[in-house]
Amino acid sequence: MSKLSSYPHAADFINMEEPPKSKEFFDDLCAVPNLLKRRFPNSRRSTHYCEALNYSRKKLPVVLSKMTLQELRHNMSTFFLQEKDQINIYDTCKVIDMGDRVLLETMPPQPRDLFEKLHASKTNLVVQTAALDEPLLTVKAELQSSSFPQKSSLFLYEDYKKFIYQQLDMFS
């Protein structure tokens, strides 16, 4: 009898005339009260999939159905504002600036920019000296005369392709 007292569930299997009550699978393994019944006391077991879906839909709060697109946009915008405030706090306290930002002035010019600079029509560069003897570039763009017809976009595209091929030395 001392062995039976140390295992309280072992007494269920001694009396063969009265079989033990069925237990949940989780109870059989761990001998802990069923947590699912505590979390969802009104839950109903159903083997029918459609019934289970309809029952869970009925249990959803009504607040979710009242959400409109305008409220969603407002919540998202305030969330990002709150996030920016938190980022600023962390930037000053925890983040160390390593100086690995990419500045536009240090980036090499793109081929399209070079092409547009080379094919700018009738531009004059004038170098002036400032009071501190630093050269200052000013660009004076003259208007195109009406005697020269403008190139169509197809010809500009072809010129651009030639310029790229020359830059890459593909056909030389």
Swiss-Prot record:
Provide the protein name. Putative uncharacterized protein YOL024W
* Organism in which the protein naturally occurs: Saccharomyces cerevisiae (strain ATCC 204508 / S288c) (Baker's yeast)
